[in-house]
Curated annotation (Swiss-Prot):
Name of the molecule in the record: Dermaseptin-H2
Domain of life: Eukaryota
One GO-annotated biological process of the protein: defense response to bacterium
Keywords: Amphibian defense peptide, Antibiotic, Antimicrobial, Secreted
Predominant cellular place of this UniProt entry's protein: secreted
GO CC annotation, single: extracellular region
Annotated compartments: Secreted
Function: Possesses a potent antimicrobial activity against Gram-positive and Gram-negative bacteria. Probably acts by disturbing membrane functions with its amphipathic structure.
Reported tissue expression: Expressed by the skin glands.
């Protein structure tokens, strides 16, 4: 359903955001 699609997109976006934050912190 629509909710499962939204959850999948939100989970993917969250993982991408965490990855970007981890990369930024790792460079410091």
């Amino acid at each position: 359903g629509l909710w499962s699609k939204i959850k999948d997109v939100a989970a993917a976006a969250g993982k991408a955001a965490l990855g970007a934050v981890n990369e930024a912190l790792g460079e410091q």
